[in-house]
Design a protein with these regions (language model features):
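Glycine-rich, positively charged N-terminal anion/phosphate-binding segment
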Residues: 2-10, 25-100
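Alpha/beta catalytic cores of nucleotide-metabolism and tRNA/nucleoside-modifying enzymes
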Residues: 1-12, 16, 20, 26, ...
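Glycine-rich tight-turn/loop motif centered on a GG-T
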Residues: 111-128, 182-190, 247-252
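Hydrophobic faces of well-ordered beta-strands that scaffold small-molecule active sites
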Residues: 20-24, 45-47, 75-79, 102, ...
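Conserved alpha/beta-domain cores
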Residues: 24, 81, 88-100, 114-116, ...
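Non-cysteine beta-strand/loop elements that form the S-adenosyl-L-methionine
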Residues: 47, 101-109, 168-178, 230-235
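Alpha-helix-loop-beta-strand connector modules within alpha/beta enzyme cores
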Residues: 63-78, 121-146, 186-210
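Conserved radical SAM core fold
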Residues: 50-56, 84, 107-120, 178-183
Length: 353
């Protein structure tokens, strides 16, 4: 069965223009990544997860992670925590920031998150999980979605017990990554669980895990009944996988790869500042330039550079034609003045995902 990935669907009252969702990923899903995802076909993009404890403590770390660009909508901002009052407060701030959806993280397997009673550990405390969803759904008019794993332990089916209860508590959509927290990202995602979850709830279910091609996306949608697929690691430094999933199988040229990386560098510097961006970007060089696109020594050379101007010069020397592609990309960007940035809203963004 050939499913049209461009079909529109609704998450609560929010219209989503396509069945492809770009996953929330810690240390990855900055605004530059999300905007790129929208350009390449994602119908919905998500922020990396925001700590509600950071909001409570009014941490003065920079506010760039709550920028909402005019070209990002629809956008879900993801929050994590284990206190209903704090979650409700965070949800109100997410609404004020201009997001379209509040997403709740019940799937992060990272120990520094689960040891606080947040993330995937909430699957073992369904009562608390439901109170959190109810608190957020009551606090804001935005639709609330929940991203979760199959459970904490290998072989767990807790998602099938907890999922319907979360919907009763107010969740307008569920995203299932059918690996256990203990698996992290090893093994495979068991989408037979996704199909079971779809049969148990009357809200849209998004299938997450091991979606890296159009064929796989079509297969998962057809066999599970999910309304959409979520792409995560496959899109790191590789927006062209989103284009391929949406039906355009053209391989990117060297010039296109370099131009997109240069735009990503510039947008990240604008968002994070040059000092933070320099370290943040290093992992992206390998992601963009890998997959046989550029020699390994070239990638290693860029990682050792401490000046982003030097990185840009070296990239343009490797693909001079990228300059013209970059100019076109820059012309297509919206005016930065169209962004929403709440200077009065101190937040803290942690790792996890």
């Amino acid at each position: 069965m050939n499913i049209n990935l461009a079909d529109t669907w609704f998450l609560g009252g929010v219209e989503i223009p396509g069945r492809l969702v770009l996953a929330p990923m810690a240390g990855v899903s900055v605004q530059a990544f999300r905007r790129q995802g929208r350009r390449y076909g994602a119908g919905l993009v998500c922020s990396e997860m925001v700590s509600v404890a950071g909001i409570q403590h009014r941490n003065e770390r920079t506010l760039e992670y709550l920028r909402v660009g005019a070209d990002e909508h629809p956008l879900a901002i993801q929050i994590f925590g284990s206190d209903p009052v704090a979650m409700a407060e965070a949800a109100r701030m997410v609404e004020a920031a201009g997001a379209d959806i509040v997403d709740m993280n019940f799937g992060c397997p990272v120990k520094k998150v689960t040891k606080t009673g947040a993330g995937a550990s909430l699957l073992d405390d369904a009562d608390l999980a439901c109170r959190l969803v109810e608190a957020v759904a009551t606090a804001v008019p935005l639709p609330v979605s929940v991203k979760m794993r199959r459970g904490v332990e290998n072989g767990s089916r807790r998602c099938l017990e907890v999922g319907p209860r979360l919907v009763q508590a107010g969740a307008a959509s569920l995203t299932l990554h059918p690996r256990s927290a203990k698996q992290m990202y090893t093994g495979t995602a068991d989408h037979s669980l996704t199909a079971e979850l779809v049969s148990l709830v009357d809200v849209p279910v998004i299938a997450s895990g091991d979606i890296g091609s159009r064929a796989r996306a079509q297969s998962v949608l057809a066999t599970t009944g999910a309304v959409a697929v979520m792409v995560g690691r496959a899109a790191q430094g590789n927006p062209w996988v989103l284009r391929e999933i949406m039906g355009n199988t053209a391989e990117p040229s060297r010039e296109e790869v370099v131009a997109e990386l240069l735009l990503f560098i510039r947008e990240t510097v604008r968002e994070l500042g040059p000092e933070r961006a320099t370290g943040f970007l290093k992992k992206f060089y390998g992601w963009y330039l890998g997959r046989g696109r550029f020699p390994r020594p070239f990638k290693q050379e860029l990682v050792t550079m401490t000046s982003l101007d030097e990185v840009e010069t070296r990239l343009l020397a490797a693909a001079p034609g990228a300059r013209f592609v970059l100019e076109r990309l820059l012309d297509e960007l919206p005016d930065p003045a169209d962004e929403v940035l709440l200077d009065s809203l101190p937040i803290s963004i942690y790792g996890g995902g």
